[in-house]
């Protein structure tokens, strides 16, 4: 180790914390601060030159100039200090720098609201996540994916450290899950505390409804619903799902007994014009839910019955046509097919001669035994032979397509033509 330069007349003494050395360095001495310097074990002070005057500075007041891993992390993080032990360092949240103490309180309030009695009974996603764990824990990684939590922070360790300070929540031993400290109380079903009111009076303001229904018990809330007004005011928006299409109101009581009393005492069906219609919401909603599937089933049965009827009718018509064709070609008595035309055949072949002739010709092809007695014994009876349709092309009117050449045989030469040739 090189010794420091001494002033004239000074003696070399052992260094101590209280000792100071002049801050002048030789002009030819060069200090390389680009490389890490070894810690000063033997000298606790070193010279620094600010001006021509000699200034003595205590080493304990000067920070260590040797770079460390924390310094490099500081540069990589653009000056953000991630030391979380003191809670004084600001953290950037959604583009805004927030002190870490304030951020911790925001995280605690937000997660406590997720697990609160106000939100949890209506949060189906969080309830299902709690049911997956026997102890009711929810992964903190799941909580961190919520929209409002993303705005606060995405640092998992920061969320864990904040939730540990909560008096309402408990963090698991592995610091990966969180749950309520006290179990969730029995969920209150608002339907059993609420009555549905229809046929409202002309003055159906909130105050008047409270005055009328307050006689049955303590009222928690009153909501008046006008589907027509909502439809006009929310054009193009999402419509609310009302269980009634007319003006109605919901009155929620503090107790079930008060709701039942209101339904029993304030319901007036005798006065069909001005009387109130009061029912428990649970009963009204149940009837409404049962009515809708019943209508769907009726419509489904109608469609099914119509299709079955069409199929049955089509099959019947098809069988009838097949039966008629079968009788037409294989019946022993052709007069049966013509109903009352049998007497006309006796008196002189009246009726549809062509159709009868076809059947007679078809039936009499083997000689005897298939025609009727009256027709076969008639003196003027001549069976009509139906010529087969000649092959060849046909014109649209049914005539043959060619008069000469193809499609028609050349007539034989007459006697005059033969004699002339000779």
From Swiss-Prot:
It is found in: Nucleus. It comes from the Eukaryota. GO terms for molecular function: RNA binding. Residues 48-61 have a biased composition (Low complexity). Residues 193-283 form the RRM domain. Its main location: nucleus. Residues 73-89, 295-348 have a biased composition (Basic and acidic residues). SMART domains: LA (SM00715), RRM (SM00360). GO terms for cellular component: nucleus; ribonucleoprotein complex. Transcriptional regulator. This is La-related protein 6A. It comes from Arabidopsis thaliana (Mouse-ear cress).
């Amino acid at each position: 180790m090189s010794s420091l330069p001494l002033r004239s007349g000074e003696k070399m003494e052992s260094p101590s914390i209280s000792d100071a050395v002049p801050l002048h360095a030789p002009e030819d001495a060069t200090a390389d601060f680009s490389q890490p310097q070894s810690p000063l074990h033997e000298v606790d002070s070193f010279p620094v030159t600010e001006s021509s005057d000699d200034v003595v500075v205590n080493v304990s007041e000067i920070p260590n100039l040797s770079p460390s891993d924390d310094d490099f992390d500081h540069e990589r993080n653009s000056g953000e200090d991630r030391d979380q032990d003191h809670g004084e360092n600001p953290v950037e949240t959604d583009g805004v720098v927030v002190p870490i103490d304030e951020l911790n309180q925001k995280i605690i309030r937000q997660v406590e609201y997720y697990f609160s009695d106000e939100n949890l009974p209506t949060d189906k996603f969080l309830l299902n996540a709690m049911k997956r764990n026997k102890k009711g824990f929810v992964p903190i990684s799941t909580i961190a994916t919520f929209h409002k939590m993303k705005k606060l922070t995405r640092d998992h360790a920061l969320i864990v450290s904040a939730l540990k300070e909560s008096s309402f929540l408990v963090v698991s031993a592995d610091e990966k899950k969180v749950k309520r400290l006290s179990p969730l109380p029995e969920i209150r079903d608002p339907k059993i505390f609420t009555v549905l009111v229809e046929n409202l009076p002309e003055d159906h303001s909130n105050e008047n409804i409270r005055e009328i229904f307050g006689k049955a018990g303590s009222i928690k809330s009153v909501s008046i619903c006008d589907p027509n007004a909502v439809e006009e005011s929310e054009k193009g928006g999402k419509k609310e799902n009302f269980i009634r299409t007319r003006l109605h109101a919901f009155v929620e009581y503090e107790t079930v007994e008060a709701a039942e009393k209101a339904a029993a005492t304030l319901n007036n069906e005798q006065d069909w014009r001005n009387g109130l219609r009061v029912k428990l919401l649970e009963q009204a909603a149940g009837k409404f839910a049962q009515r809708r599937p019943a209508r769907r089933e009726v419509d489904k049965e109608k469609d099914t019955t119509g299709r079955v009827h069409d199929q049955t009718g089509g099959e019947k018509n098809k069988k009838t046509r097949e039966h008629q064709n079968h009788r037409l070609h294989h019946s022993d008595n052709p007069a049966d097919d013509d109903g009352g035309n049998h007497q006309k055949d006796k008196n002189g072949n009246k009726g549809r001669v062509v159709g009868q002739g076809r059947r007679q010709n078809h039936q009499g092809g083997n000689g005897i035994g298939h025609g009727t007695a009256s027709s076969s014994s008639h003196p003027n009876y001549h069976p009509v032979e139906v010529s087969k349709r000649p092959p060849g092309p046909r014109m649209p009117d049914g005539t043959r397509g060619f008069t000469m050449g193809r499609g028609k045989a050349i007539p034989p030469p007459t006697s005059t033509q033969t004699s002339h040739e000779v």
